[in-house]
Amino acid sequence: MVKDTLFSTPIAKLGDFIFDENVAEVFPDMIQRSVPGYSNIITAIGMLAERFVTADSNVYDLGCSRGAATLSARRNIHQPNVKIIGIDNSQPMVERCRQHIAAYHSEVPVEILCDDIRHVEIKNASMVILNFTLQFLPPEDRVALLTKIYEGLNPNGVLVLSEKFRFEDTKIDHLLIDLHHQFKRANGYSELEVSQKRTALENVMRTDSIETHKVRLKNVGFSQVELWFQCFNFGSMIAVK
């Protein structure tokens, strides 16, 4: 695993964070050291796939990056005639994802596409995964994407939505942000790295509250919506059609 040192030296002109070749190269290390509970979420995606994925259906991993969630789901799918479609708009991520998927043998076919998830049709889905992806979409595009997902899910299909959250209570919000930064420092990131990455993400990642997510998912049509995992200001929700 290549160590993430992208923000370890001062950057004179710090642009917006993008999922380019450099990020794709270090992404597994970056996300493990940056997102508390990430491994638990990936493991549980496999457990949810085992419960929810049905025969003759599709599974979508929207914003699949290097394929961790796709592989977790794939390892736990035991139903016949299931296909996984992973989509990411970063070509470097897609190339590495394809290599990663090809390294593991499975009877479950996987197709990895380089595309904008807003333009991809969702159909005959028993499971859709949005793992730390929605927060990078413009807020005005989120309802349309979730509506498309809902309409493409079969009855009793599940959406797994993992996100970084913000909190309406300012003191709690600041506390959880501070704890997250402490988590990153404990994982070897310096103050400079934490600060520069935060600045790079400011205009790219726009977070919502848990309540905003719940209301939006229910308004789209999901019958059951619940937070199933949280660590500091990161977590994951399930929404069942």
Swiss-Prot record:
Question: Which of UniProt's keywords are assigned here?
Answer: S-adenosyl-L-methionine, Transferase
Cross-referenced InterPro entries, in alphabetical order? CmoA, Methyltransf_25, SAM-dependent_MTases_sf
- Give EC number(s), comma-separated: 2.1.3.-
The family database entries (CDD domains) matched by this protein are listed as: AdoMet_MTases
Q: Name one GO biological process term.
A: tRNA wobble uridine modification
Is Transferase tagged as a keyword?
Answer: yes
- This chain's protein is named Carboxy-S-adenosyl-L-methionine synthase
Which species does this protein come from? Answer: Haemophilus influenzae (strain 86-028NP)
Record gene name: cmoA
